[in-house]
């Protein structure tokens, strides 16, 4: 992305929207984070715990949940899979019984894959990102919303991506899932306008996480990404400022550029998705 375009945009930009969040302190809350054993989810758990919140994270692997507990003293963990409605229902029963004061849900679980659409895939495997990134978040909201609506000042944070605004052709299903998450979150915010629950969308840019670097190592060679600790600080500051959309760094550029130069931005993303070669 041209440096002139980066410099022309403020670091974080969001218009007030119907149902936008109220200013709130992220202190003394009970927070449930899906996909909290690594990357953004784990860093969010660390920072929120340090600020005096009671934090619960979910994940699919017992060994990673144990590692998260070791990394974050006082962390509560549950094995759960957002792709499985029965698993979500069981999680709801457990959390609502043990943590009836739950007032914050962070839909962070997800996967990002490099997919070539001219290759052969099993149909259910091809849409795995839709199941985890989109359907899982919708199901989590549907399951936990009745509990959250009982507490004034509750919060739902849906984690989308800067790619919700300009797709990354190397990750087509991921891009589609995050664009849909953006639309769903806007609708959820509008429908819950005036209710007890505020709706926030966090759209991270490329972020230094194992998921991102492992899957796109060739394409991202030499490219910069936001430090995950810095991203989470942006997220918490945005929530406390009452921003309905939090778009740190390049995500803000993508949102604005998608409106003023959509074709140009898509071409840039096509170039970015090509594997780097020596001497290039």
Segments and roles (model prediction):
Residues 80-91, 123:
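The beta1-alpha1 cofactor-binding region of Rossmann-like NAD(H)/NADP(H)-dependent oxidoreductases
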